[in-house]
UniProtKB/Swiss-Prot annotation:
Family under the similarity heading: Belongs to the NAD-dependent DNA ligase family. LigA subfamily.
Active site: 132
Originating species: Burkholderia lata (strain ATCC 17760 / DSM 23089 / LMG 22485 / NCIMB 9086 / R18194 / 383)
Keywords, comma-separated and alphabetical: DNA damage, DNA repair, DNA replication, Ligase, Magnesium, Manganese, Metal-binding, NAD, Zinc
Lineage, uppermost ranks: Bacteria, Pseudomonadati, Pseudomonadota, Betaproteobacteria, Burkholderiales
Protein name: DNA ligase
Length: 691
């Protein structure tokens, strides 16, 4: 939502307060009515606290419609308004340990709890601790134990009737359990979506080519406020009860913890991550315990909630205009925050992947100061329309690498610059290329680039490549970090004295590695090609290349068209090969590897051109015993004619040659309608005739 009003300075408190009210009301409307939040929580909290402080310093600036005096937005036009019998209030927030200690002190003082001479509470208050879910608050009304209405919070006084949608949530009972139920019960709780259900929903959205949801809260809110309850019924929503509005027909329970236990007996879903504690230390202990397990919880939370446990003490403490005095939300460090993107650089990964990285003005988010954040790839930068100079939303959750979620387009400066992917690697100067149908651009200097050095050496030494026994990752780390090895060719220059000085490398280990390196000098062309670590070139493709060309030079000089003639080499593999050998840095390292005294292999003639007869490219399956041909002889003749001999029958099979006692392969061929030949039919094919 656009925020075009100019931001007044703090030296103009009346204008500043009006601007803050406008910003917060716009955010409230986007959050509560449109279900499209456009401000991170941390930014909203910052603006809200600033307005609170302004109104405290200048009481004359307080207006009846100030966001500090109410909860959220107005009911949207698509749903029937519902006036709450008991207001659905918000909670005041605490962020630091000092905030929690101050809350406990205020409560204890108001309840006339005993304190010592230093002012410390010696008669601790009992609190019920719960999770603060990141979902949508609702009220469920039961009459004589039967579910009759559900409504959203709205502005705390008036919400929206979402009864038919809530009726589709399977975890919400339509009738309460037990013989003794109240005449009227308003249950307060949260509609949310579990992480696993959110992932499945987005999978369905992708499969249907529909817009994906940004996060579980948006998905839950959007699902709950569908005008068609059939759509809501298809969404995997859940519910947890945590509070009460109206109770008629039976006395109120003595404690909040007893209320939640009673809810469970009625069949209402109540979260088990709750605890009764004493005083500020107990509150902080619960907060830390939940913080440690936060990422492993099956749903999103953004903090915990503390409530004075005894009902009579809650009543004594009462309410302020927008929140109860007996409760506090203790929020985790914000996982999203706003900052300025000052530059976009690129990083080179171990495999040559080029990743755009946002350089940011320092911002505290997710419990740490963040100055860099990933932009994933060039397509993501374009899709999110992120530009240098933008005010951006940065997200950091747990140990996840910080990322730029998006930009606030209404704050974009006139000189904001688009990101341009460089054409040369910033580390080694090799060309940057991006293969068709791939999102990631890569440095093509795989054998030369320092950023890829360890990965290139590790791959080169693999058992299926040069098979250098004893050259593990820890040894490679030392060799690279001590600048003893820069490319695979340098491995063959290592001497005994150098190796023997490596950490935890005895003389015997040094000699064993030298022996392995000497042995690795005598290899095969296929192993050497595989060892180069060319993207998309596996062991099988390396063998096909060696068989087709016979020697390395023709492969290095081959055009894409010539590479496409190789068995099982398609456009992507051909392009990858061509890019790799076109990079001069790679060719230099290869020549160093082929220098006298280094790596050698037996050369062979190029394979003859593939036959062009009726069997060329066909797949044939042999089964049973033929009258005059052994299976090996038949296979050799078929392969010489350009056919591929497979071991099982599938839809891709062109012919089945069946002899005596053919068995299940013959049955499957007949089921699939695949032509079945005897030995005479095979000879006709080999002679170029279609049977």
């Amino acid at each position: 939502m656009a925020r075009t009003q100019a931001e007044p300075p703090a030296s103009q408190p009346d204008a500043r307060a009006a601007w803050l009210r406008d910003q917060l009301e716009r955010a409230n409307y986007a959050y509560y009515v449109l279900d499209q939040p456009d401000l991170p929580d941390a930014e909203y909290d910052r603006l809200f606290r600033e307005l609170q402080q302004l109104e405290t310093d200048h009481p004359e600036l307080v207006t009846p419609d100030s966001p500090t005096q109410r909860v959220g937005g107005e009911a949207a036009g698509g749903f029937t308004p519902v006036v709450h019998d008991a207001p659905m209030l918000s909670l005041n927030n605490g962020f630091a340990d000092e905030d929690i200690a101050a809350f406990d002190k205020r409560v204890a003082d108001a309840l006339d709890k005993t304190t010592d001479l230093a002012g410390s509470v010696t008669e601790p208050v009992e609190y019920a601790c719960e999770l603060k879910f990141d979902g949508l608050a609702i009220s469920l009304r039961y009459e004589q134990g039967v579910f009759v209405q559900a409504s959203t919070r709205g502005d705390g006084t008036t919400g929206e009737d979402v009864t038919e949608n809530v009726r589709t949530i399977r975890s919400i009972p339509l009738k309460l359990k037990g013989k003794h139920v109240p005449a009227v019960l308003d249950v307060r709780g949260e509609v949310l979506m579990f992480k696993r259900d959110f992932a499945r929903l987005n999978e369905r959205q992708r499969a249907a080519e529909q817009r994906e949801f940004a996060n579980p809260r948006n998905a839950a809110a959007g699902s709950l406020r569908q005008l068609d309850s059939k759509i809501t019924a298809q969404r995997p929503l859940s519910f947890f009860a945590y509070g009460i509005g109206v109770l008629d027909g039976m006395p109120m329970l003595d404690t909040h913890s007893a209320l939640l236990d009673w809810y469970e007996s009625l069949g209402l879903p109540v979260n088990r991550e709750r605890e009764v504690v004493q005083g500020a230390e107990g509150l902080l202990g619960f907060f830390r315990k939940i913080g440690e397990k936060r990422e492993s919880l099956p749903y999103d939370i953004d903090g915990v909630v503390y409530k004075v446990n005894r009902r009579d003490e809650q009543e004594r403490l009462g309410f302020v205009s927008r929140a109860p005095r007996f409760a506090l939300a203790h929020k985790f460090p914000a996982q999203e925050a706003l900052t300025k993107l000052v530059a976009i650089d690129v990083q080179v990964g171990r495999t040559g992947a080029i990743t755009p990285v946002a350089r940011l003005e320092p911002v505290f988010v997710g419990g740490a100061t963040v100055t860099n954040a990933t932009l994933h790839n060039e397509d993501e930068v374009r899709r999110k329309d992120i530009r240098i100079g933008d005010t951006v939303i940065v997200r950091r959750a747990g140990d996840v690498i910080p990322e730029v979620v998006g930009a606030l387009l209404d704050r974009r400066p006139a000189d904001a610059a688009e990101f341009v992917m460089p054409t040369e690697c910033p580390v080694c100067g090799s060309k940057i290329e991006r293969l068709p149908d791939e999102a990631i651009a890569r440095c093509t200097g795989g054998l030369f680039c320092p950023a890829q050095r360890k990965q290139a050496l590790w791959h080169f030494a693999q058992r299926r490549a040069l098979d250098i026994d004893g050259l593990g990752e820890k040894i490679i780390d030392q060799l690279v970090e001590l600048n003893l090895v820069r490319t695979p060719a340098d491995l063959f220059n290592l001497g005994f004295a150098t190796l023997a000085e490596l950490d935890r490398f005895a003389e015997k280990s040094a000699q064993n590695l030298l022996d392995s390196l000497e042995k690795a000098k005598h290899t095969t062309l296929a192993r050497f090609i595989y060892g180069l670590g060319i993207r998309h070139v596996g062991e099988s493709t390396a063998k096909d290349l060696a068989k087709h060309f016979g020697s390395l030079t023709p492969i290095m000089d081959a055009s894409i068209e010539e590479l496409l003639e190789v068995n099982d080499v398609g456009p992507i593999v051909a392009e990858s090969l061509h890019q790799f050998f076109a990079e001069e840095h790679n060719r230099t390292v290869i020549e160093q590897l082929r220098a006298p005294g280094k790596v050698t292999w037996p050369e062979g003639p190029p394979a003859p051109k593939a036959p062009q007869g009726v069997l060329a490219g066909k797949t044939v399956v042999l089964t049973g015993t033929l009258p005059t041909l052994t299976r090996d002889a038949a296979k050799e003749m078929l392969e010489a004619a350009g056919a591929k001999v497979a071991g099982s029958v599938s839809k891709k099979t062109d012919y089945v040659v069946a002899g005596a006692e053919a068995g299940s392969k013959l049955v499957k061929a007949e089921e699939l309608g695949i032509p079945v030949l005897d030995e005479d039919g095979l000879h006709q094919l080999l002679e170029g005739n279609t049977p």
